[in-house]
Amino acid sequence: MRKSVIAGNWKMHMTCAEAKSYLEEFIPLIKNIKDDRKVVIAPPFTAISTFSNHSDFDYLDISSQNIHWEDQGAFTAEISPKMLLEHGVSYAIVGHSEPRKYFSESDEQINKRAVFAQSSGLTPIVCVGETLEQRERGEADRIITRQVEQGLENTDPSNLIVAYEPIWAIGTGKTCEAEDANKICSLIRKLIGFDDVIIQYGGSVKPNNIDEIMSMSDIDGVLVGGASLDPNSFARIANYK
């Protein structure tokens, strides 16, 4: 049985002091979480040490928000697996729509990040998703297929999470219908060809829709943005029914 992964992406939010305060409130709310799931938070790089130094660290895992495909070198503003592992990081988000959009990340670059993450001992959370225009033109399946085939080439599906995040649903308040999201997640699973690969949904996930999302057969977790910034909201999501 696939284990659910409930992940929060804080993006460029939370100072170290704010992260510490958040954890003090959040940790007690997930201490009795069911053992069929795990909780992951991707804080800003500056706040990662706040997590790794927290006494209740066993209750959740840490993810980075990106990763480079080299361990060191002249790569300004990048961060390497070696640096992250030193702070107890277990996961790395790659291919999120924001770096794809703002920094023109290609599927080839995303693939290099994912492959190097795995070879370094991290589990990549590889994001895929279509724009509203692509969806309205009936191109969603083709776009997702390309992103999966190119972005996941030579990766190990047993140490991989794929997050389906329709770009038009991220931070907009618009949520992809659960059945529609499940169809795309089913497509991703078939493309990968490994039934046990963990597939998440992301895009305006909130306490009021988490139960329906997680009732879908091919959705194994969620990648949460804004709702993960509030400890009570994210705890409700993590403790879905």
From Swiss-Prot:
Recorded catalytic reaction(s): these are: D-glyceraldehyde 3-phosphate = dihydroxyacetone phosphate
A Gene Ontology cellular component where this protein is annotated is: cytosol
What's the protein here called?
Answer: Triosephosphate isomerase
Record has Hydrolase as a keyword: no
The protein's location, in the record's own words, is: Cytoplasm
Q: Where does the chain bind substrate?
A: 9-11, 171, 204, 225-226
Annotated metabolic or biological route of this protein:
Carbohydrate biosynthesis; gluconeogenesis; Carbohydrate degradation; glycolysis; D-glyceraldehyde 3-phosphate from glycerone phosphate: step 1/1
Q: What is its main location?
A: cytoplasm
**Active site residues of this protein:** 96 (electrophile), 165 (proton acceptor)
SUPFAM superfamilies from the UniProt entry: Triosephosphate isomerase (TIM) (SSF51351)
* Function summary: Involved in the gluconeogenesis. Catalyzes stereospecifically the conversion of dihydroxyacetone phosphate (DHAP) to D-glyceraldehyde-3-phosphate (G3P).
| Subunit (UniProt) | Homodimer.
Give GO BP annotations, semicolon-separated: gluconeogenesis; glyceraldehyde-3-phosphate biosynthetic process; glycerol catabolic process; glycolytic process
Q: What class of enzyme is it?
A: isomerase
Instruction: Give the family this protein belongs to, as stated in its UniProt record.
Output: Belongs to the triosephosphate isomerase family.
Entry keyword set:
Cytoplasm, Gluconeogenesis, Glycolysis, Isomerase
InterPro entries found in the cross-reference section: Aldolase_TIM, TIM_sf, TrioseP_Isoase_bac/euk, Triosephosphate_isomerase, Triosephosphate_isomerase_AS
